[in-house]
Amino acid sequence: METSVKIVKVHTERTFAIARSSADTFERVIFEISVDGVTGRGEAAPTSHYDQDAEGVAAALEDVEVGDPWDIEGALARNSTMPPSALTALDNAMHDLAARRLGVPVYRLLGLARPEPVSAYTLGIADRETTVAYAKKLQAHRILKVKVGGWDDIETLRAVRESSEADLWVDANEAFSPEEAIEVVTELKGMGVGMIEQPVSASAGPESFQNLTEAAFPVPVIADESAITAGDVPELAGSVSGVNVKLAKCGGIRRALEMIHTARAYGMLVMLGCMVETSLGISAAAQISGLVDFVDLDGAMLLADDPYSGPLYENGLILLPDGPGLGVKPR
């Protein structure tokens, strides 16, 4: 058995801005594990918001203890102190390897039906004219997710609503105070948006979320930054409509499944999200997309230089390849 680790830089076609940051270059860490000529790959998408960077994640993966390559749970337990994005790369690579050795897609390995998710396409924060023009170019997309960071962006969203027939989701990335957020979600409800994601800081607590959820009803309010792992779900139950599960946050496919099932046990909606990732990371998440209510797996669609091929993206529809594993290969 051999393992390898490398850092790759990828670039978005447009500067990607959210409420707290903007960037057009992202470092991703690729972990590979090879057994008997078969290679499994996984991607880590570290972010400074969770105190992770590519160098630290790569160093953790260099020291990984895999053990039996079939024993995914054992490997995750042995390496549980790694940064979550590093654990994601390990988890996804081991699923890819196991499924390739068996000659089946990962979703079959997991006992799931073939998913055909329709993903939102995210519009980062920009001036009104730019955002509206970009939304018009994306008319074929069924769902647009619009990032907002202040009241000016709410007015931009209103202009998008007037120029686009797509379903609109809104992501504030913790931008508003609990008091402001009540006004914001009331305004958004009046615009007919389909979902509102993380209007307030994760530190605001369940009571603030409950007030927002009541004000927004029947529009669902989804927790993202407040919902990192399955352990966060019980505290949020009854306060939000649902949680955003991201493999890079929680630690990969197996931990994502745990989070999804926990949310379902509490009667919550589930969103499946991503970071800006290559098709390697997106394909891993897409394997379990049939289990959720909202799909936001557009990370690779935003890239100008995706180093992997496999999934096809057609106006938000993600078509997974028929091949084994994650179905992804280097370009």
Question: Regions from the language model: what does each represent?
Answer:
Residues 102-127, 156-165:
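N-terminal small/glycine-rich loop or linker at the start of catalytic domains
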